[in-house]
C-alpha cells in the first residue's frame, strides 16, 4: 500500500463517521473503505453501522462483508480486500476506528517495533509455570 493517498475520517464509536463518509463519497464520486473490524463479517449487520444495501449501490465499498463469522480474519487479509479501491482512479475515503487497521494502512505491517516482537518470542519459549511466575 505504499504511496497510496486516502482521506481519513476516524473517531469513536457512534460519532456519525459512517454517515458523513457516505455523504462525502457520494458527492465526490469516490469509493469508501471501512476500517471497522466488525464490518468485515457477513450477516453481522446489527450494531456495526454498515451501510444499508441500497446505499452500497450508490458508491463502491471495500472492507465490508468480506468473510463469514465462522472464518478467521486478520489485518493482512483486510489490506488485500481494500487494495482494489485505489484502482478506481479517485482517492478513497477510509472510515472507521479500528486502530490496528489504520496503523497497518498508514505505517505498514512491519511497523511493529522489534522490542515487543523480541519480548513475545522470548515469552513464547517459556513454560506455562514460568509465565505464571513472571506475572506474579
What do these predicted ranges mean?
Residues 1-136:
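Phosphate/pyrophosphate-binding catalytic cores of soluble transferases and nucleic-acid-acting enzymes
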Amino acid at each position: 500500500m505504499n504511496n497510496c493517498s486516502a482521506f481519513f475520517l476516524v473517531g469513536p464509536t457512534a460519532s456519525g463517521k459512517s454517515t458523513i463518509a457516505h455523504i462525502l463519497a457520494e458527492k465526490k464520486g469516490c469509493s469508501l473503505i471501512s476500517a471497522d473490524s466488525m464490518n468485515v463479517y457477513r450477516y453481522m449487520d446489527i450494531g456495526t453501522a454498515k451501510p444499508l444495501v441500497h446505499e452500497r449501490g450508490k458508491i463502491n465499498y471495500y472492507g465490508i462483508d468480506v468473510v463469514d463469522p465462522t472464518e478467521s480474519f486478520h489485518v493482512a487479509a483486510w489490506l488485500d480486500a481494500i487494495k482494489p479501491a485505489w484502482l478506481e482512479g479517485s482517492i478513497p475515503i477510509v472510515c472507521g476506528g479500528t486502530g490496528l487497521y489504520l496503523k497497518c494502512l498508514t505505517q505498514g505491517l512491519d511497523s511493529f517495533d522489534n522490542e515487543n516482537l523480541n519480548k513475545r518470542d522470548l515469552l513464547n519459549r517459556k513454560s506455562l509455570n514460568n509465565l505464571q511466575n513472571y506475572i506474579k
